[in-house]
Amino acid sequence: MPVAGPLDIVSLDGEARGIGRLTNEDGTPGKVVFVEGALPGERVMYRSHRVKPSYEQAGVVNILRQSASRVTPQCKFFGVCGGCSMQHLDSRAQVAIKQRVLEDDLWHLAKLRPDVVFRPIAGPDWGYRYRARLTVRHVAAKGGVLVGFHERKSSYVADMTSCEVLPPHVSALLVPLRELVGRLSIVQRMPQIELAVGQDVTALVLRNLEPITAEDEAELRAFADHHNIQFWLQPKGPDTVYPFYPLDRTLTYTLPEFGITMPFKPTDFTQVNHQINRVLMSRALKLLDAQPGDRLLDLFCGIGNFTLPMATRAREVMGIEGSEALTTRALANAQHNGLHTKTSFACRNLFEVSADDVAALGKFDRWLIDPPREGALAVSKALAELSQSGGDAADLLPKRIIYVSCNPATLARDAGLLVHEAGYRLAGAGVVNMFPHTSHVESMAVFERD
């Protein structure tokens, strides 16, 4: 396609692409153009690579007017690697854009504005990613094995030798890992390596589609000893993961404010950013404002990340999770921290929960909801139904709900139900910059009911 423009960029979309709009010959607004690499306030020349009747997708060719928020990306692989999409934007501007995405979704999808916009939660911009899934490919044309993230909008693996968002000691492992995998008998049968960094242990889970040989075992042991890491193997599905070497180490992360240590497996869901998780926990518990005599409910509780801190503030906490394995792990973590007498856990499918199911749980004073990207639609509908039933059923509704979200669109959808149909008000909302340099928007909202 030929170079086109100039085009004024007015905003960013959910993938951090600049958004501009063409003007028709009669002066009316024309189609939208999504421009990779362009920032709000910039005027650019662009080249389209996909043209549709109502929009075009393009890349920047030349920047005629540059945004004051544009910075030089720290990573030399930015633009090729798909792991980050916003390194060219100042970190404060990144947070501001994410806050606007949250507020726009709440308004456009639910016609809601929070009573209070919380100050954003932010932390380190680099070296924060303590959990990641790296793809492995043997590519003869590139000289051997590649280990890293996918190229942007591609199934190919980026030829990367470092990563600025991984902890430095993990970034330094990328090249040695390429060399290690190249020496293994299963070099063509290892599609991914999963990374989990704990307080004192770094674990790498090798997805081995075939059994490893004795020679492979020796290579892995030597590598683990030299680089001070722990290898796990996953021959089949997630439930087949087991520690290979060394066996005397346990992954943990800590929540010092609450005196809690959380053991976990490398394939468990844990927050990617441990520093932000601590700040998020502190703010969530303050907003929950649990009293010593309260009964609390934690939905989508995972391994007990919120449940256990909540138990240090209240009389009783119940955690509900859809995974039997995570429910078992949460119970073990409660015992590990001496909180098993104040906590209970149940495995339920929260995507199919009904009003009767919620009523059967009994009265809880305050709830915390931390769903995956799909949100908590069934839970929100159940609360709306109980509210509209009136009488004793409505009395079961909690007076306060803290909703931690990793998808502002599903948060907005659920917020609409909670406010317009369940009788809550949106007391506050704000973003949590859990994933700097990406377009991922984590947020927290508070709902109150009189």
Swiss-Prot record:
Active site (record annotation): 406
Record-listed E.C. numbers: 2.1.1.190
One GO process term, biological-process aspect: rRNA base methylation
Enzyme class: transferase
Catalytic activity: uridine(1939) in 23S rRNA + S-adenosyl-L-methionine = 5-methyluridine(1939) in 23S rRNA + S-adenosyl-L-homocysteine + H(+)
InterPro entries: 23S_rRNA_MeTrfase_RlmD, MeTrfase_TrmA_CS, NA-bd_OB-fold, SAM-dependent_MTases_sf, TRAM_dom, U5_MeTrfase_fam
Binding site for S-adenosyl-L-methionine: 271, 300, 305, 321, 349, 370
CDD domains for the chain: AdoMet_MTases
PANTHER family per record: 23S RRNA (URACIL(1939)-C(5))-METHYLTRANSFERASE RLMD, RNA M5U METHYLTRANSFERASE
NCBIfam families (UniProt xref): PRK13168.1
Protein name per UniProt: 23S rRNA (uracil(1939)-C(5))-methyltransferase RlmD
Organism: Ralstonia pickettii (strain 12J)
Gene (name only): rlmD
